[in-house]
Design a protein with these regions (language model features):
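N-terminal leader/targeting and accessory segments in enzymes
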Residues: 1-97
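Short, polar loop motifs at secondary-structure junctions
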Residues: 68-76, 224-228, 247-248
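Phosphate-binding loop of NTP-binding sites
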Residues: 93-224, 230-240
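Conserved beta-strand scaffold positions in the cores of enzyme catalytic domains, especially
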Residues: 16, 85-87, 110, 136-138, ...
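Residues at the C-termini of beta-strands that transition into short coil/loop
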Residues: 20, 89, 140, 245-248, ...
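Adenine nucleotide phosphate-binding catalytic loops in nucleotide-utilizing enzymes
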Residues: 203-204, 239-261
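A short, gly/pro- and small-residue-rich
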Residues: 52-65, 85-90, 183-185, 208-210, ...
Length: 261
């Protein structure tokens, strides 16, 4: 990514404190990962255990001059000269909004992968298959959370020809935000299992939440051997192409006759 600080301010709907010119090429949420301070925008995220604003003094001392915050530090103009503070209502929502606007710039195939297990494995398989012929941008490691997905999508560049991103959820209501950020054109539903089941009333409820990722995709790849997955898809208003794989049904789009280990 490459945006001026003015452009970022507009994209995330922030109020800007400071007038220092800056070009932003990197987004940071973890102070331990700082590499290029002058081109970095730090999002001070809050969690139950931590508050990103506590790291502003350290990051400023290390050269960072651009921050997204929910509360502007008292005396910022004298404590942090030559800096910009972008004030927002929610720092996580601002990060997600920036990624969503960044994704809007790319009219390319994007594969969105979800499921209880196997997301990272499938992503890496696709990368190995596609990268010899295409420039592929993919999620780093297992970046599939409410923070990891926007950080992944912000890696898209003008050279990217296809994106491959994971989307993981742990509770109801999370997938819509990830869908808006990834905006997949092709969907892959790996498996449906018990991971994070404690926050859902039933496995069917979790399935319905996960398939929201595929609402606007042109095609979805899934297992027709999974009865719950099949039931959820039949109840979902999905208008794209359904490409099922099976080890039982020879009529499936992809019939697996044998598996060699």
């Amino acid at each position: 990514m490459n945006y001026t600080i003015e452009k970022v301010t507009t994209l995330i709907g922030a109020r800007r404190y400071g007038d220092k010119d800056a070009n932003i090429s990197f987004v940071l949420t973890d102070s331990r990962s700082l590499c290029f301070p002058e081109e970095t925008l730090f999002f001070a995220l809050k969690s139950e255990r931590n508050d990103g604003q506590n790291y502003i003094p350290e990051l400023y001392a290390r050269g960072v001059r651009n921050f997204v915050v929910e509360v502007v530090p008292e005396g910022w103009a004298t404590r942090y000269p030559d800096s910009n503070f972008l004030k927002v209502v929610g720092s996580l929502e601002a990060l997600q909004r920036l990624a969503e606007r960044h994704r809007d710039e790319y009219l390319i195939p994007i594969v969105g992968i979800t499921g209880s297990n196997g997301k990272t494995m499938v992503k890496e398989w696709l990368y190995q298959l596609l990268s010899p012929q295409m420039v592929v941008t993919r999620s780093p490691r297992s970046y599939n959370s409410q923070i990891g997905v926007p950080l992944s999508v912000l890696l898209l560049t003008e050279n990217t020809q296809v994106g491959v991103f994971e989307a993981g959820i742990s509770q109801p209501g999370e997938m819509m935000a990830l869908r808006d950020i990834i905006q997949p054109t092709i969907g892959v539903f790996t498996t449906l299992g018990t991971a994070h089941q404690e926050n859902f009333p039933s496995i069917e409820a979790k399935c319905h939440e996960k398939i929201k990722l595929f609402h606007d995709t042109e095609a979805i790849v899934y297992s027709s051997d999974d009865e719950v997955m099949m039931q959820c898809l039949s109840q979902y208003d999905y208008k794209g192409q359904k490409l099922d794989w099976s080890v039982k049904n020879a009529e499936a789009a992809f019939y697996i006759k044998a598996i060699e280990k």
